[in-house]
């Protein structure tokens, strides 16, 4: 058996086409979705991510505003910029590109963003609403992962989901989203003693640890859905995931590649959240 490859780039493009149609309808009502991205410093990776977000906004018709601030900016000045954007009716979503310089407390910055504009889904209020199954902005990568699994037409309810990794950005929230879909969820992490045995029980395996090709065929239940969140660069310069793709391909039922798997879905779900925020606000732009 050779696994079906879940092409995240194709799923993302399909969803972006739907978003484009939604934005056209909103603009007919005088509503223009707007996203503000704050970039602090000159980190090349952060700048690359921001460019991808700007390109995505342009593609679907979202107004985007990039605020570039120096590495030396004070926390107070950054908080004041967020306050300004919180009060700007043209802006439906505020995203602060992470990581931030060491002298700025990330927690304070995230908590300053209005929950109504928290399109990253990182604010504690957003997290609390997600945990209790309320309507809220879902974190983009975990939301994208659930959407990719749904593309397989697998009924998630009752399935065993194993999440390898427990980061606040991917591991913890993605498990909660699957729990909200009535799956049974097991978390594995660096202190888990029987990871291989637990992994082999998974109908759906999510891997987000940042270790190249860590997961091999002997971790996989035959026919399982395998979602590889890792993005690692080998010495050759080639990108690879946390899953040994070629090794697992003949055991899994479905698998995401790296690149063109989970990555394209992250920005797409950010665009989705921004459009949803604009719908909720319903502010007509003059």
UniProtKB/Swiss-Prot annotation:
Transmembrane segments: none
Pathway named in the protein's UniProt entry: One-carbon metabolism; tetrahydrofolate interconversion
Family: Belongs to the tetrahydrofolate dehydrogenase/cyclohydrolase family.
Name of one Pfam family that matches: THF_DHG_CYH_C
Record-level Gene Ontology MF annotations: methenyltetrahydrofolate cyclohydrolase activity; methylenetetrahydrofolate dehydrogenase (NADP+) activity
Name of encoding gene: folD
Catalytic activity: (6R)-5,10-methylene-5,6,7,8-tetrahydrofolate + NADP(+) = (6R)-5,10-methenyltetrahydrofolate + NADPH; (6R)-5,10-methenyltetrahydrofolate + H2O = (6R)-10-formyltetrahydrofolate + H(+)
Database matches in PROSITE patterns: THF_DHG_CYH_2
Any Gene Ontology biological process: tetrahydrofolate interconversion
Organism encoding this protein: Bacillus cereus (strain G9842)
HAMAP family in the cross-refs: THF_DHG_CYH
Keywords, comma-separated and alphabetical: Amino-acid biosynthesis, Histidine biosynthesis, Hydrolase, Methionine biosynthesis, Multifunctional enzyme, NADP, One-carbon metabolism, Oxidoreductase, Purine biosynthesis
Protein name (database record): Bifunctional protein FolD
Description of how the protein assembles with itself and partners: Homodimer.
CDD domains associated with the record: NAD_bind_m-THF_DH_Cyclohyd (cd01080)
Enzyme nomenclature, EC number: 1.5.1.5, 3.5.4.9
GO CC annotation, single: cytosol
Binding site for NADP(+): 165-167, 190, 231
Function of the protein: Catalyzes the oxidation of 5,10-methylenetetrahydrofolate to 5,10-methenyltetrahydrofolate and then the hydrolysis of 5,10-methenyltetrahydrofolate to 10-formyltetrahydrofolate.
PANTHER family: C-1-TETRAHYDROFOLATE SYNTHASE, CYTOPLASMIC (PTHR48099:SF5), C-1-TETRAHYDROFOLATE SYNTHASE, CYTOPLASMIC-RELATED (PTHR48099)
Stored InterPro entries: Aminoacid_DH-like_N_sf (IPR046346), NAD(P)-bd_dom_sf (IPR036291), THF_DH/CycHdrlase (IPR000672), THF_DH/CycHdrlase_cat_dom (IPR020630), THF_DH/CycHdrlase_CS (IPR020867), THF_DH/CycHdrlase_NAD-bd_dom (IPR020631)
